[in-house]
């Protein structure tokens, strides 16, 4: 298959993906990114940190999807609150998304000091861009190519979250406003060119199997308007909060293997690999996804 045709194929997938399907930046290390999926989780773990991550999918394809993120999470204990922030850039073929996400959570403690409830709000900004120079000149009559090269959209979300140190669970909705997002120069275009609401439901539970080892079964469900729902389940093993490994499965999409370690109680490193069950698997090599995350703790986390 010629490279220009492959590039156009990737463009069609990515434009359709962002205009009608899942439009939020993605990580398979979601246990490391609670506030990314739910603003109410911001600061609730009381682990002040900053981090970076890089995700590389389907490397055998030209213009394969890549995601870069920098993020932070901080508890505001005097205010019974927490804040979280994400800056990210997605690149897929000739398309790219650059975005920012700010989250604020108010924390409510019950009489049992281990029980915490979070009520959160988030603000998102997304710039979707198209590099027309990367597309074949023969596609010049396409209405998408006749439109603007970039589009900025602002949206918001909200969530609730609960944790008691063992059980954590939450529900959130992103892109409540459903701002318009289309590059096509087509009169009376359908409403599909917009940000769709994403509903996220998550739960995990720590099971102590010894003095030093925890099993953590976890689940994440995404309900996306105008797109199939996604169900992700996993099991992690954590040893002394210093070494962890796990297995995950997103139904009908991919399996995930991941492992990580903490260095000097101030730095943690996590690597994961996705093996896709989709038709991409027919291509030899490069049809999976690699993700690497690095966190820097601003204070020594409580053990």
Predicted regions, residues:
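Short, basic/polar N-terminal leader/transit segment immediately after the initiator methionine
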Residues: 3-5, 22-23
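Positively charged n-region of N-terminal signal peptides that target proteins for export
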Residues: 1-4, 110-112
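Subset of outer-membrane beta-barrel
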Residues: 20-303
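Sec-dependent N-terminal signal peptides
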Residues: 4-15
């Amino acid at each position: 298959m010629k490279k220009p045709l492959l590039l156009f194929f990737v463009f069609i997938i990515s434009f359709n993906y962002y205009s009608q399907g899942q439009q939020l930046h993605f990580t398979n290390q979601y246990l490391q990114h609670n506030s990314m999926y739910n603003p109410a989780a911001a600061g609730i773990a009381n682990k002040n940190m900053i981090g970076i991550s890089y995700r590389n999918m389907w490397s055998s394809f030209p213009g394969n999807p890549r995601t870069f993120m920098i993020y932070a999470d901080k508890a505001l204990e005097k205010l019974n609150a927490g804040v979280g922030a994400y800056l990210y850039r997605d690149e897929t073929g000739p398309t790219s998304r650059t975005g920012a996400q700010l989250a604020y959570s108010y924390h409510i403690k019950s009489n049992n000091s281990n029980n915490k409830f979070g009520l959160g709000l988030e603000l998102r900004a997304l710039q979707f861009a198209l590099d027309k120079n990367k597309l074949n000149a023969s596609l010049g009559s396409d209405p998408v190519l006749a439109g603007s090269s970039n589009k900025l959209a602002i949206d918001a979300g909200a969530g609730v979250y609960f944790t008691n140190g063992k059980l954590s669970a939450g529900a959130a909705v992103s892109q409540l406003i459903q701002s318009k997002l289309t590059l096509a120069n087509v009169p009376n275009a359908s409403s599909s060119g917009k940000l769709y609401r994403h509903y996220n439901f998550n739960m995990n539970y720590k099971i102590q199997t010894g003095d030093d080892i925890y099993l953590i079964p976890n689940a994440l469900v995404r309900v996306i308007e105008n797109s199939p729902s996604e169900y992700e389940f996993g099991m992690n093993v954590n040893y002394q909060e210093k070494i962890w490994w796990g297995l995950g499965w997103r139904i009908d999409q991919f399996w995930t293997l991941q492992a990580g370690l903490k260095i000097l109680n101030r730095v943690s490193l996590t690597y994961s690999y996705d093996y896709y069950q989709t038709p991409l698997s027919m291509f030899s090599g490069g049809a999976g996804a690699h993700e690497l995350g690095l966190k820097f703790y601003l204070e020594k986390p409580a053990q």
